[in-house]
């Protein structure tokens, strides 16, 4: 009886280690989003911050024209993908119900090749993102929070 269960246990254990390709792809797009747009605890949030972060995140070959870093915690950003902190915006996007601290880095200077120079703009904004399977996968824009009149 024990020998009969051995192959089943082996198949079960091996099955636990296999990740369906769609889940692996979703996770990689989310990780790419975090690499490009997430920085929990920024330092400075000035031009030097932008130049350092853009280089550190490999966004300078060629120099990316504009990139925004969202500050705070990952859970709050994920919540934009749900009704907890987000609502539909346009055709395929979600806009945050609450504002986030963000730093937008804009490339200044002529050449699209390193060394890249960036100008920083920081502030509190609502973010617009695309989500797949409850995870942010694309940063679209940040907008000033509209106040009710």
Curated annotation (Swiss-Prot):
GO terms for biological process: actin filament polymerization; angiogenesis; antibacterial humoral response; antimicrobial humoral immune response mediated by antimicrobial peptide; defense response to Gram-positive bacterium; hematopoietic stem cell proliferation; innate immune response; negative regulation of apoptotic process. GO terms for molecular function: actin binding; copper ion binding; DNA binding; endonuclease activity; heparin binding; protein homodimerization activity; RNA nuclease activity; signaling receptor binding. Its EC number is 3.1.27.-. Has weak tRNA ribonuclease activity by itself due to partial autoinhibition by its C-terminus, which folds into a short alpha-helix that partially occludes the substrate-binding site. In absence of stress, the ribonuclease activity is inhibited by RNH1 in the cytoplasm. In response to stress, dissociates from RNH1 in the cytoplasm and associates with cytoplasmic ribosomes with vacant A-sites: ribosomes directly activate the tRNA ribonuclease activity of ANG by refolding the C-terminal alpha-helix. In response to stress, the angiogenic activity of ANG is inhibited by RNH1 in the nucleus. The active site is at 37 (proton acceptor), 138 (proton donor). The modification Pyrrolidone carboxylic acid is found at residue 25. Pfam families: RnaseA. GO terms for cellular component: angiogenin-PRI complex; basement membrane; cytoplasm; cytoplasmic stress granule; endocytic vesicle; extracellular space; nucleolus; nucleus. Secreted ribonuclease that can either promote or restrict cell proliferation of target cells, depending on the context. Endocytosed in target cells via its receptor PLXNB2 and translocates to the cytoplasm or nucleus. Under stress conditions, localizes to the cytoplasm and promotes the assembly of stress granules (SGs): specifically cleaves a subset of tRNAs within anticodon loops to produce tRNA-derived stress-induced fragments (tiRNAs), resulting in translation repression and inhibition of cell proliferation. tiRNas also prevent formation of apoptosome, thereby promoting cell survival. Its main location: secreted. It comes from Oryctolagus cuniculus. It is an enzyme of class 3 (hydrolase). This is Angiogenin. The keyword Disulfide bond applies. Belongs to the pancreatic ribonuclease family. TRNA binds at residues 45, 105, 127.
